[in-house]
From Swiss-Prot:
GO terms for biological process: mitochondrial translational elongation. It comes from the Eukaryota. This is Elongation factor G, mitochondrial. GO terms for molecular function: GTP binding; GTPase activity; translation elongation factor activity. The keyword Transit peptide applies. GO terms for cellular component: mitochondrion. It comes from Culex quinquefasciatus. InterPro entries: EFG_II, EFG_III, EFG_III/V, EFG_IV, EFG_V, EFG_V-like, EFTu-like_2, G_TR_CS.
Length: 744
């Protein structure tokens, strides 16, 4: 039976799946419970904003029979994409939260996480990649590799996630998949090659060529349900032969079997190529590149086939846990992915969400089996929970299941936990899985309820959102008597402000954005501080000697403490108190009141008293030591620098460059393509506020930009002077003149 025959009967299959219930497994949930390990894929769909991720997911759900009809992003048909379940998402046409779903394709169960592309929601991508086995990296054939693509690529590398690349939007004016492949090699450092080629681009996009099987694929009828195989068009055969040879050549560099065939000048069979692509993709030494246009319903079914052929099942990925016993070094253990239930259950909570029926906790099962009615233990808190319901998720809809196995993604109700917690059924298992990397917030805003009577709802909203999203922080600043929220960008905080009004009927007022500046030393500074207090009875005595020194630039967002003492001048039981005193003082600097960072506290020596020394005495000694360094050291203020990418028609290039220069930007690169240009620049975040409106007005609404955090860097002398003056005015303090000169 040909592919076209198979796919012509898919609507009938979908009908029986949804309506007749005549299959052995009456629903996707039932099928998922019985799937074998080799027939499971856990994948994420990640990319830069507006690359077409949500549209692609909508097509996948339709072709696999999961939904009966397709809807568009931005809710143009008043419905909106299935995976954008939040009303705000459908209005703005962006994905804010990672929606989870599962579907079935060719008897394989596929769990899909659709992730946000906007940099302000990057923690959602982190959470998704942590629990996935493979990913589809979606790239726009016009925009190519953009700023958030670089971020997603780094995240995939951090969690060692194998990926396929899908170059989308072949139908767009200016589509150039060949340029995008070049960017993947130069900017992402991927060993990538086409395994498909487009048959025409823009309005002439007719289908794709499968270079592995050497066949042309056409997607007939309006919905693209029928995939028709045909011979490669005559005018494309030379190009296809060249690209296939390029594919074989790149595979030969990373796969021994293909390398031998290449040296012997033998032509590999399609089976040889598929085996080599799978092996090298799993090892992350090769990235297969597919093409298509999700909006025009071309290339989606072959992408699904590639997910089955080239991405790993849960048994092909090594998942580690740590055995953490008190007083012992943590031991690494490999978790058993077999779906036989012989080993005890181990799961990781990777996302929290307030649902209609209480808190919803998303988990991935890494080992064993979990059944409805079982009791689970939170390893961190030791709390025991009995499970009344197990559910699988389809966007914001739920299907109850009786049990879940290793490799499954599911959700629970009524479990009090934090994101990154490990759950087990055996309380003796002291296992902990690696937690999820959470970036520090870069922007703060003052926030308050518009009406004082809404304070209760405001408190509930803040408590829920800070629990759901670890990058959303909430604090009260006693110096300015303001409540502050911090996050990954203006959009991040604006979205939460709008959600407070929509979901809690609590309108809020946001203040002007405030940048998270940092303070650090320019050069090492020694300290020798004695804290001594005698007031009758037991006194206080503690002396600390050491060096406070700046860390290298790539570590300027952290602070470190090292105990380099020899002997018993500083008893070991007092060292944690010294570290505590240092970290408390690091919360507020002298120049601008911002946190200290990029510093290393080296404790070299000290002294104690047999009676008067205590933890409090040494903590106060450490604080006194930092105060002495405030007075004697040379300090500077650091500011977050953003990697900015601006795209606009080329007639506005001079204007855009001028605007970036005015905002203290450093141009790092430019690109041009068919009447459009892209500029890459590094700009201080403090200078980026209000840029969106300025860019729109100066480019007649045609320009767009994106930015992501790059690093902390010393701020300009005039900015440092201004920050110091503002802080002094608010505190009524004066700083010695020597502090106001930044030493290089």
């Amino acid at each position: 039976m040909t592919i076209s025959c198979l796919l012509r009967i898919r609507p009938a299959l979908a009908k029986s799946f949804f309506e007749n219930g005549q299959r052995a497994f009456a629903s996707h949930a039932a099928f998922a419970e019985h799937a074998k390990l080799e027939r499971i894929r856990n994948i994420g769909i990640s990319a830069h904003i507006d690359s077409g991720k949500t549209t692609l997911t909508e097509r996948i759900l339709f072709y696999t029979g999961r939904i009966k009809e397709m809807h568009e992003v931005k809710g143009k048909d008043n419905v909106g994409a299935t995976m954008d379940s939040m009303e705000l998402e459908r209005q703005r046409g962006i994905t804010i939260q990672s929606a989870a779903t599962y579907t079935v394709w060719k008897d394989h169960n596929i769990n899909i996480i659709d992730t946000p592309g906007h940099v302000d929601f990057t923690v959602e991508v982190e959470r998704a990649l942590r629990v996935l086995d493979g990913a589809v990296l979606v790239l726009c054939s016009v925009g190519g590799v953009q700023s958030q693509t670089l971020t997603v690529n780094r995240q995939m590398k951090r969690y060692n996630v194998p990926c396929l690349a899908f170059i989308n939007k072949l139908d767009r004016m200016g589509a150039n998949p060949y340029r995008v492949l070049g960017q993947m090699k130069s900017k992402l450092n991927h060993n990538a090659a086409f395994i498909q080629l487009p048959i025409g681009v823009e309005s002439n996009c007719k289908g794709i060529v499968d270079l592995v099987k050497q066949k042309a694929l056409y997607f007939d009828d309006q919905l693209g349900l029928t995939v028709r195989e045909d011979e490669i068009p005559q005018d494309m055969r030379t190009e296809c032969d060249e690209r296939r040879h390029e594919l074989i050549e790149q595979l030969s560099n990373v796969d021994d079997a293909i390398g031998e065939l290449f040296l012997e000048e033998k032509t590999p069979t399609p089976q040889d190529l598929m085996g080599a692509i799978r092996r090298s993709t799993l090892k992350r030494t090769f990235t297969p590149v597919l093409v298509g246009t999700a909006l025009k319903n071309k290339g989606v079914q072959p992408l699904l086939d590639a997910v089955l052929d080239y991405l790993p099942n849960p048994g092909e990925v090594e998942n580690l846990a740590m055995i953490e016993k008190k007083g012992e070094e943590p031991q690494k253990v490999f978790l058993n992915p077999a779906r036989d239930g012989k080993d005890p259950f181990v799961g990781l909570a990777f996302k929290l969400e307030a649902g209609r029926f209480g808190q919803l906790t998303y988990l991935r099962c890494y080992q064993g089996v979990l059944k409805k009615g079982d009791s689970i233990f939170n390893v961190r808190s030791g709390k025991k929970v009995r499970l009344a319901r197990l559910v699988r998720l389809h966007s914001n809809n739920m299907e109850d299941v009786n049990e879940v196995y290793a490799g499954d993604i599911f959700a629970l109700f009524g479990v009090d936990c934090a994101s990154g917690d490990t759950f087990v059924t055996d309380p003796k298992l002291e296992l902990s899985m690696e937690s999820i990397f959470v970036p520090d917030p870069v922007v703060s805003m003052a926030i308050k309820p518009t009406n004082t009577k809404d304070r209760d709802n405001f408190s509930k909203a803040v408590a829920r959102f800070t629990k759901e999203d670890p990058t959303f922080r909430f604090a009260y600043d006693p110096d300015v008597k303001e409540t502050l929220v911090s996050g990954m960008g203006e959009l991040h905080l604006e979205i939460y402000a709008q959600r407070m009004e929509r979901e809690y009927n609590c309108p809020v007022t946001l203040g002007k954005p405030k940048v998270a500046f940092r303070e650090t030393l320019v050069a090492p500074c020694e300290f020798d501080y004695l804290h001594k207090k005698q007031s009758g009875g037991q006194g206080q005595y503690g002396r600390v000697t050491g060096i406070l020194e700046p860390l290298p630039p790539h570590q300027n967002t952290v602070i470190e403490f090292t105990d380099e003492t020899i002997g018993t001048n500083v008893p070991k039981q007092f060292v944690p108190a010294i570290e505590k005193g240092f970290r408390q003082m690091a919360e507020k600097g002298l120049l601008s009141g911002h946190k200290l960072s990029g510093l290393k506290f080296r404790l070299l020596d000290g002294a104690h008293h047999i009676v008067d020394s205590s933890e409090l005495a040494f903590m106060l000694a450490a604080q006194g030591a930092i105060k002495s360094v405030f007075e004697n050291g040379s300090w500077q203020i650091l500011e977050p620098v953003m990697m900015v990418e601006v795209t606009a028609p080329e007639e506005f290039q001079g204007t855009v460059i001028g605007q970036l220069n005015k905002r203290h930007g450093i141009i790092t690169g430019t690109e041009g393509t068919e009447g459009w240009f892209t500029i890459y620049a590094e700009v201080p975040l403090n200078d980026m506020f209000g840029y969106a409106g300025e860019l729109r007005s100066s480019t007649q609404g045609k320009g767009e930009f994106s930015m992501e955090y790059s690093r902390y860097s010393p701020c300009m002398p005039d900015v440092q002077e201004q920050l110091m003056r503002e802080y002094q005015a608010s505190q009524g303090i004066a700083v010695p003149d020597k502090k106001q000169k930044k030493k290089n």
